[in-house]
């Protein structure tokens, strides 16, 4: 049986109203076991300042972002189940959900699904990569009982 170990770090000034650990676990379990038997993922929920700093340092973008993915590269000859870290910015997720008219829980789920696929090596830089990644995201989100996160773009 596939197992995803979650290390959840809540690093916001106010952690009230965030999804439960069980929800984060459910969202990870909907993605990762399809691609990898055992894995460990850290999800760190942060405020705008930390997201901004990390986005500037690692992507050269001078603003906070919804989710950052940091895949762990296992050294040759070692076997480890550590997949990597997701850093999700609470304020950006909440703002995007409101602006896009999406249920907040669904947008949180989408950020975990999207970030997890990045940890697994998927990307959306090229159009064909984006189509493949978005199709997988949509399939997983529908299986979780949420709407297609890209429905507005398809209409």
UniProtKB/Swiss-Prot annotation:
Keyword line: Cytoplasm, Endonuclease, Hydrolase, Metal-binding, Nuclease, Ribosome biogenesis, rRNA processing, Zinc
This enzyme's EC code(s): 3.1.-.-
Broad class of enzyme this protein falls into: hydrolase
A single GO BP: rRNA processing
Localization in the cell: Cytoplasm
GO CC terms in record: cytoplasm
Residues that hold Zn(2+) according to the record: 114, 118, 124
Stored Pfam families: YbeY
Cofactor list: Zn(2+)
Annotated GO MF terms: metalloendopeptidase activity; RNA endonuclease activity; zinc ion binding
NCBIfam families: rRNA maturation RNase YbeY (TIGR00043)
HAMAP family, per the entry: Endoribonucl_YbeY
Family statement: Belongs to the endoribonuclease YbeY family.
Biological role: Single strand-specific metallo-endoribonuclease involved in late-stage 70S ribosome quality control and in maturation of the 3' terminus of the 16S rRNA.
UniProt-recorded name of the protein: Endoribonuclease YbeY
Species per Swiss-Prot/TrEMBL record: Escherichia coli O127:H6 (strain E2348/69 / EPEC)
């Amino acid at each position: 049986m596939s197992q995803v170990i979650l290390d959840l770090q809540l690093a916001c000034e106010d952690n009230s109203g965030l999804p439960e650990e069980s929800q984060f676990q459910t969202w990870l379990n909907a993605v990762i076991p399809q691609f990898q038997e055992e894995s460990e993922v850290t999800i760190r929920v942060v405020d705008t300042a930390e997201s901004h700093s990390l986005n500037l340092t690692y992507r050269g973008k001078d603003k906070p972002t919804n989710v950052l993915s940091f895949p762990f590269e296992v050294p040759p000859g070692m076997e480890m189940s550590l997949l990597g870290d997701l850093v999700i910015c609470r304020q950006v997720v909440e703002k995007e959900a409101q602006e896009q008219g999406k249920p907040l829980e669904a947008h949180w789920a989408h950020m975990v699904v999207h970030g997890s696929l990045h940890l697994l090596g998927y990307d959306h830089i090229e159009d064909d990569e984006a189509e493949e990644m978005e199709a997988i995201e949509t399939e997983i989100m529908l299986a979780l009982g949420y709407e297609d996160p890209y429905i507005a773009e398809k209409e």
